[in-house]
UniProtKB/Swiss-Prot annotation:
Keywords tagged on the record: Cell membrane, Membrane, Transmembrane, Transmembrane helix, Transport
Stated role: Transmembrane (T) component of an energy-coupling factor (ECF) ABC-transporter complex. Unlike classic ABC transporters this ECF transporter provides the energy necessary to transport a number of different substrates.
Protein's name in the database: Energy-coupling factor transporter transmembrane protein EcfT
Transmembrane segments: 28-48, 63-83, 107-127, 152-172, 248-268
GO molecular function: transmembrane transporter activity
Top-level division of the source organism's lineage: Bacteria
Length: 268
């Protein structure tokens, strides 16, 4: 993979996580996101990331692959960390210079927020790498099926999510091709200061948007040719079957949740 965006891609591997019901994986990710917001200390984050590493091993995904997937949000993580360092007050004053103070609470809050974002991106990356877009769409539609009684277009929402997930890596691959084409013409995209780099990326947006609209039109024509109708009840060739291993896997998060709550209310 030439580009660094990993999330949204499917990695076909014969692993325990790959064979789990996609509904179980979606529910696990949802519960994990809720759980990680209860982390409040280094020890609680240690437990959460130990769980991520355990799931990563079950999915047979290498750690460097997940770390590579974090590179697109690297600058956002740095920005979040710096904002908390300079704006969040409390605790001991570490640095004081011309009215600017850096205090311990700011550093801790910045680190904790960054770790939460890293954990969420890593667990979501594992889910997309181990679940095909079709399975994700089916799982999303099945889980939201009760909302149909409120006249919500559940199937259409599921299809939008599936197409969006599929288009993310496709557009990133297209961006790679455009960048290589621009470099072959002598364009300096990766050099210069930040302002220069931003200006150099502007010419990339027009061909990228044109390519995106072309692919969207081709997809719409292909779906229409195959007789796709969003208003007709859809059947699935591959039926989802909830098994005992899915229940066991979903309950893996319970002991971690108990540990985090015990640590939180015991002041550790």
């Amino acid at each position: 993979m030439k580009n660094k965006l990993i999330i949204g891609r499917y990695l076909p591997i014969n692993s325990f996580v790959h064979h789990l019901d996609p509904r179980a994986k979606l529910m696990f990710v949802f519960l994990f996101i809720i759980l990680i917001f209860f982390c409040h200390s280094p020890l609680t984050y240690l437990w959460v990331f130990a769980l991520i590493l355990f799931i990563m091993r079950l999915a047979k995904i290498q750690l460097w692959f997940l770390i590579k997937g974090l590179t697109p949000i690297f600058f956002f993580l740095i920005f979040t960390l710096m904002m908390h360092i300079f704006l969040t007050k409390g605790g001991y004053v570490l640095v004081e210079w011309h009215g600017i103070t850096i205090e311990t609470n700011g550093i801790l809050e910045g680190l904790y927020i960054s770790l939460r974002l890293i954990g969420i991106v890593m667990i979501a990356t594992i889910m997309t790498l181990s679940t095909s877009p079709i399975d994700l769409t089916d799982a999303f539609e099945r889980l939201l099926a009760p909302l149909k009684m409120f006249k919500l277009p559940v199937h259409q929402l599921s299809m939008i999510m599936s197409i969006a997930l599929r288009f993310i890596p496709t557009l990133m691959d297209e961006l790679d091709k455009i960048i290589l084409a621009q470099k072959s013409r002598g364009s300096e995209i990766s050099s210069g200061n930040i302002a220069t780099r931003i200006k150099s990326f502007i010419p990339l947006l027009v061909p990228l948007f044109i390519s995106a609209f072309q692919r969207a039109e081709e997809l719409a024509v292909a779906m229409e040719v195959r007789g796709y109708d969003a208003n007709v009840k859809r059947t699935s060739y591959r039926q989802l079957k909830w098994q005992l291993r899915d229940t066991i896997s979903l309950t893996m998060i319970i002991p971690i949740a108990i540990i985090l709550f015990v640590l939180k209310y015991s002041g550790v």
